[in-house]
UniProtKB/Swiss-Prot annotation:
Tetramer of two alpha and two beta subunits. GO terms for cellular component: cytoplasm. Keywords: Aminoacyl-tRNA synthetase, ATP-binding, Cytoplasm, Ligase, Magnesium, Metal-binding, Nucleotide-binding, Protein biosynthesis. Belongs to the class-II aminoacyl-tRNA synthetase family. Phe-tRNA synthetase alpha subunit type 1 subfamily. It is found in: Cytoplasm. One of its GO terms (molecular function) is magnesium ion binding. Mg(2+) binds at E246. It catalyses: tRNA(Phe) + L-phenylalanine + ATP = L-phenylalanyl-tRNA(Phe) + AMP + diphosphate + H(+). The gene is pheS. This is Phenylalanine--tRNA ligase alpha subunit. Its EC number is 6.1.1.20. Its cofactor is Mg(2+).
Length: 330
């Protein structure tokens, strides 16, 4: 047995160790041939001989397993030394991923408002008539309710056409003061150079008790926001109409392409429309059970902002997955 143990100890590779095992326990191995002799023995002699062989086999297997573990660890360490990789090495030929320009724009918008302590609120993509229309003061005959503008399901639910329903859900679940934005996807039946059936909006809402909030607060906040997004641009507010705000306004900035001089993009007006806003209509407060409060709301299209920030002429190109375009925004 000592000779077998010394053979195991002298093995320097896994192959050598395996050859020793075969020479001992293989079909023609030393111990295998010894076990074959048991058939010629009888009684006590057979029992003693078998016990001795079993003990020898167990000791051999134990020594073999210890040596096997040692040689496996040695082989692994040698392989790791040969396969050393520098994980700090940057391969300039690899195609590193990057955020889509729409997501880059969305992140920049969210960054601004979260710095002003606006919360980020979410809502379902499939909405009901109450949250998407009725509670927002959109009457039954409003054009937005028409099937040519909104995606309806058979059970009269719909794909939300704006993120404004999130404002309603937030007011129904929270009490003033509220400072929130609702970023997310919305859906409308429209597809051309400046519209897609699915696009992204960020809508904001500020509500406080009493009459603390007015249009001047809204105007100041949006002017600062637009200068943060587009740099030193001029901002103007034009009277408009939205069912859920009164008074309402559309907001323009001086054209980022021609610096307000007039070009094809701004239709030679020098101005580009970027968002809508207004003081929340009192009828909206009635639907959510608010009393003696004041507030303002605003909404913008993220794709519109991305087009202006990155000077992308066709909105549809941002949804085609063309790497030649997307690689420019790494």
């Amino acid at each position: 047995m000592q000779d077998l143990i010394s053979q195991i100890s002298s093995a320097s590779t896994l192959a050598e160790l395996e050859n020793i095992k075969v020479s001992v326990l293989g079909k023609k191995g030393i111990l295998t041939l010894e076990f074959a002799k048991l058939k010629d023995l009888q009684g006590e002699e057979k029992k003693e001989f078998a016990n001795g062989l079993n003990k020898t086999r167990d000791e051999f297997n134990e020594a073999y397993q210890v040596k096997l573990k040692e040689l496996e660890e040695k082989a692994l360490n040698e392989k790791m030394k040969q396969d050393v990789q520098d994980f700090s090495f940057f391969d300039e030929t690899s195609n590193a991923g990057a955020l889509h320009p729409i997501m880059q724009t969305m992140d920049k918008i969210i960054e601004y408002f979260t710095a002003l302590n606006f919360s980020i609120e979410k809502g379902p993509l499939i909405e009901d008539d109450f949250h998407n229309f009725e509670a927002l003061n959109l009457p039954q005959n409003h054009p937005a309710r028409d099937m040519q503008d909104t995606f309806y399901f058979e059970d009269k639910t719909l794909l939300r056409s704006q993120t404004s329903p999130v404002q309603i859900r937030t007011m129904l679940s929270q009490k003033p003061p509220i400072r929130m934005i609702a970023p997310g996807a919305v859906f409308r039946r429209d597809f051309d150079i400046t519209h897609t059936p699915m696009f992204h909006q960020v809508e904001g809402l500020v509500v406080e008790e009493g009459d603390k909030i007015n249009f001047a607060n809204l105007k100041d906040m949006l002017e600062n926001f637009l200068k943060y997004m587009f740099g030193d641009v001029k901002v103007r507010f034009r009277p408009s109409f939205f069912p859920f705000t009164e008074p309402s306004a559309e907001v323009d900035i001086s054209c980022v392409f021609c610096k307000g001089c007039g070009c094809r993009v701004c239709k030679h007006t020098g101005w580009l429309e970027v968002l809508g806003c207004g003081v929340v209509d009192p009828n909206v407060y009635k639907f959510v059970g608010y009393k003696n409060v004041s507030g303002y709301a605003f909404g913008l299209g993220v794709e519109r902002f991305a087009m202006l920030l990155h000077k992308i002429p066709d909105l549809r190109s941002m949804f085609e997955g063309d790497l030649r375009l997307l690689e420019q925004f790494r």
